[in-house]
């Protein structure tokens, strides 16, 4: 769970009866607005990504496998990281990271090298505010495409992944007059 104040990722343990108990908390590096969990480094442990809306960064926190996390490693963006998501966008078997910057009017894509080390790959610009990104297979070709949501401009933009591992995206659709903060896909 991301908690903006006091800037923590908190781990809650399920008791099996629908209730949870606090297990641990660790600083997220800037006030988390959204967290997404996935195995970022292929070690079988769940790791956490955080969009730190109180700062100009996103954070990666590696799971230790015992319900605790290692300290946050932050990646800077323009401002107001508002959402985070994961998906194997380059088809190499690991999770890549996309981070939306509300104030920076963009979405930044970070490619995973397979060991959980992320490098900036490319940027998609928003008309007004990058509010959410959703990786999903738009065209049923087996690779992940992107839906980008711009809450202030009321638009949804669909990008088709044209080259798999080379991460070349083609604009395919943009719809205006929609208010969208978040979405999910199977």
Please place each PLM-identified region on the residue numbering:
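Acidic carboxylate motifs that coordinate Ca2+ or other divalent cations, activating on Asp/Glu
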Residues: 43, 92, 96, 141, ...
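Short, solvent-exposed loop/turn segments at conserved positions within beta-propeller repeat blades
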Residues: 4-7, 53-56, 102-105, 151-153
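Hydrophobic beta-strand segments that make up the repeating blades of beta-propeller
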Residues: 1-3, 48-52, 97-101, 146-149
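A short loop-to-beta-strand structural motif that recurs across blades of beta-propeller domains
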Residues: 8-12, 57-61, 106-110, 155-160
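Extracellular carbohydrate-recognition regions
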Residues: 166-180
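Blade-level signature of beta-propeller repeat domains, shared across WD40, Kelch, NHL, RCC1
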Residues: 131-167
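Beta-propeller blade termini
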Residues: 33-42, 82-89, 131-140
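Blade-edge motifs of beta-propeller repeat domains
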Residues: 13-30, 62-79, 111-128, 160-166
């Amino acid at each position: 769970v991301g908690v903006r104040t006091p800037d923590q990722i908190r781990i809650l343990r399920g008791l099996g009866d629908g209730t949870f108990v606090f297990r641990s908390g660790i600083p997220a590096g800037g006030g988390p607005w959204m967290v997404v969990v996935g195995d970022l480094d292929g070690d079988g442990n769940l790791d956490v990504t955080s969009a730190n809306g109180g700062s100009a960064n996103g954070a990666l926190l590696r799971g230790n496998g015992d319900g605790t996390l290692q300290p946050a490693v932050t990646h800077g963006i323009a401002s107001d990281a508002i959402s985070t998501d994961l998906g194997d966008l380059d088809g190499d078997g690991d999770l890549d990271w996309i981070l939306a910057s509300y104030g920076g009017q963009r979405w930044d894509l970070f490619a995973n090298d397979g060991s959980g080390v992320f490098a900036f790959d490319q940027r998609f610009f928003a008309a007004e505010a990058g509010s959410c990104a959703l990786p999903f297979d738009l065209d049923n070709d087996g690779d992940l495409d992107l839906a980008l949501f711009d809450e202030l401009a009321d638009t949804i933009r669909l990008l088709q992944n044209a080259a798999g591992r080379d991460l070349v995206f083609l604009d395919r659709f943009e719809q205006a007059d929609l208010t969208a903060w978040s979405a999910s896909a199977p």
